[in-house]
Amino acid sequence: MIPKNMESFLNEHLPKATFKARLKKDQGKCYLEFSNLDVHLLSHLGIISDKVGPHLVACIWDEESPLEIGGYVVVDSLAGGRPSMGGIRMLPNISPSDIHNLARGMTLKNAAANLPYGGGKAGIVAERSLSAERHTKIVRGFAKLIRRYKNIYLPGPDVGTNDADMKSIAIENGLDNALSKPADMGGNRIDELGAAAGGVIIALQTPLKIMPRLRILPQFVNLEIPNIENLTILIQGFGAVGAHASRILKERLPEVKVIGISDLEGYLYNESGLPIGELFKLWKENKLVTNIYFKNQIISEGYKHPTKFSTNADNLLLEHAFCFIPAAPIFNYLCVRSSENPSMTVDRMGKWSVIIEGANTYSPDPYRKTARIRMEQIVYREKGVMIANDYLVNSGGVIFAAQEHIVKTPDHLQIPEEMLGNSEAVNRWLKDHTNEFAELSKQRLIAGQEY
């Protein structure tokens, strides 16, 4: 059945005549498709088309499933190459405009990384509290829906999905129709490796070398770059990007202090540095860490404990540090106006010297672009904070994932057509070719490292 949140959204934003004229059905699978020529209808969905795209916006659901299975696919542009490439986000209130924003970010990111792919994205409308079994069933149902677009859209993981979900999609649609699969499928498993986070840390190391040149600009004349042992970091969003970023940072630059992190349940701050090893282990086990760490370590000592905990995650952005890394799925972490509902307004933000955008923040929406320009004028031009844009710095994940398509799967390893959709048969196939898939995974990992 169509997800209730999705059904409410579509009924509210699209004329009834559109359903009659545009709805396509295929054995219970339902498709509402729009191109960038459908300017008026796209505007109803909150999407403003331009010279770049979108190439395709599809609202898709399975009306015959007893589960709520549905969501959106946006192929923004194929100008950079075919197919488009981008992850599948899984959240309860995801909208077509959200997916379009992310797809445009992928267009720019893939182009900036010189990858021969267009930009795309998908979103599954589903609760985050699903059981593992129900989650997998919904992902596999969604895989059947997006099979229609396999020639123009290549999915990977994003917020709410992971490498195991990409295996589920590959079981349904074939090895070459999902990215970031586990190693037993020859995949590059970007979530497990923390590939996106690795790019963020490289992006931090580079500005450290070039930032002294900024002192010729009036807003940076008093810029102070601390010694490495005095370098401090705040990370908004201790998740797939943020948690791995902290881990990789401590491996490459162990002297650097991560002094603040946040997640959905709050934030932790310690000016002497947080125990990243312990927090990363907690994240691997529980996904949310701030409240658990508070209960296990802080509550017994109260205010005497050197680490501060707050249930207001956004207030992390009040703290001071040399570098701030937004890594939460929030477009507007900073804005000038409180009416734009940011994590923090620029007049209240902490004192930082550089922002490395680990999260996807780009939006083609003209109103959001205007808000972004207002923010940058104050943060960069007035406050003297360097901003490293998301599509330039967080491309590590797509670079590694793309190798699964660039380094081709040999024909003899392709899952036979008659096995697709049969988990047991596919797993037997993988087991029978264990060594070859392991070697393929190794080749793709090396290719990503050398790219």
Question: Where are the predicted features?
Answer:
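Glycine/serine-rich phosphate-binding loop and adjoining beta1-alpha1 elements at the start
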Residues: 70, 90-91, 107-231
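Conserved active-site and cofactor/substrate-binding residues in soluble primary-metabolism enzymes
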Residues: 94-98, 133, 137, 161-164, ...
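Rossmann-like adenosine-cofactor binding region
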Residues: 266-269, 274-387
